[in-house]
């Protein structure tokens, strides 16, 4: 049994990450290093810093500290105030003439590439298929509209992500950046195309896997973390969705994507800004005093899910999840854990130690007997229940959001009394859309005392099509009182909207068309149906539809979790 324990220089053979989807404002005193020249292998030094004009907003963000003082206690910084995600403010104009901060090549993107179909729509950018004219090779092109870059921090975030992608260039499991282009209206990033799907989706499609296969995936994940840390990069948003396969073949490399929250760090440096995703965030992030150890925690959560199909810290609300992250016990007694090897449990336990000083480092985790090449992970197939749970965990019920929108648009003026005027009050520029800033201003006007992170969560829950704004239909759907939603005639009308052929069932084809109509892309239709379909006939009948609409009744957040209990936009605006 060989222990193929690699060091920083060799870690480049085991890793992954890239894509531009989400940015976190960066303080003025933390300017990112300059863009390094392209390289075929990872550099062992961070690029030299460049001078970037300070932002007028930076005084509101104290994101990093070099003072290793005692962390703020959980009592002083309640977990339920932590931001699971940070959204960029919608903007009307750019604060910098050039985002890339260099002389842009005279060649334009369209001179070199043919732009093809849309691959995905993110919060702040659209990804297209693009084909290199000279070679016919396919790539992914992410287009970021400059009008959405409102603050200097927004501009710096884009620059920093590009810098980090170049800094990690050459790593076998990090999505490669091919080039960055800029014109008068957008920044375009051309990247390696990952057409093989997400990590969990691949496992679900295959229908079976073993501890040994899980250990191989864990080795890739931890290997990327070690490579990032050795090059002075902290990812800060590790989760299964950020791991994609290049192609559908069995031997496809796994690539890490999305460095939108990543940041350069120095040894001993600590950070305070709360970033990440609820299930995967480390406890010290919620306590606002953390370092690179947070990435190991997130990887430990992913490995726990790979082995059991459920997250280690679970609750029906984000507040509850955060409380579990801070205080909850690890469950190794429920199924399937009695059948999982002791070595696997030992690794997960050591990666999920709450004290970051006692937690395994990425290098130590990579050297663990369960993870290392030819290690002790058994080849015995994992219980089929793990796959079933994994499928449930990965699926997100988007049908309910679409149905609420349909019901909202069918209501009479009397039924939505007051909501129309409320929308007009919030939509101060009469654009027909409520921006994040308008929502914040409106909530303050009605006396709602909410943190930015809570307003971000409300915005995300209401913004069905991920456009970054709330249109009238989305607003009504988000603020409706539940007694209107549960009326029989409204439910039947909504069901009939999706049941185009009047068969009495919503089929996969009908749901696919509905997703296209609502601008909801990158969706596994069979998973949405499977989450609702109780008799396993592959379609949704009226009774199943009604039960879905009446169950929970709180807005769904990312990864299928309920966002914040029964608290939603209606409550925030004091409409309920």
Curated annotation (Swiss-Prot):
Ca(2+) 1 binds at residues 427, 429, 431, 433, 438. It comes from the Eukaryota. The active site is at 237 (proton acceptor). Activated by calcium. Autophosphorylation may play an important role in the regulation of the kinase activity. It catalyses: L-seryl-[protein] + ATP = O-phospho-L-seryl-[protein] + ADP + H(+); L-threonyl-[protein] + ATP = O-phospho-L-threonyl-[protein] + ADP + H(+). Its main location: membrane. The keyword Kinase applies. One of its GO terms (cellular component) is cytoplasm. ATP binds at residues 119-127, 142. There are 3 contiguous domains conserved in the CDPK subfamily: a kinase domain, an autoinhibitory (junction) domain and a calmodulin-like domain. The autoinhibitory domain (377-407) inactivates kinase activity under calcium-free conditions. Belongs to the protein kinase superfamily. Ser/Thr protein kinase family. CDPK subfamily. May play a role in signal transduction pathways that involve calcium as a second messenger. This is Calcium-dependent protein kinase 11. The lineage of its organism: Eukaryota, Viridiplantae, Streptophyta, Embryophyta, Tracheophyta.
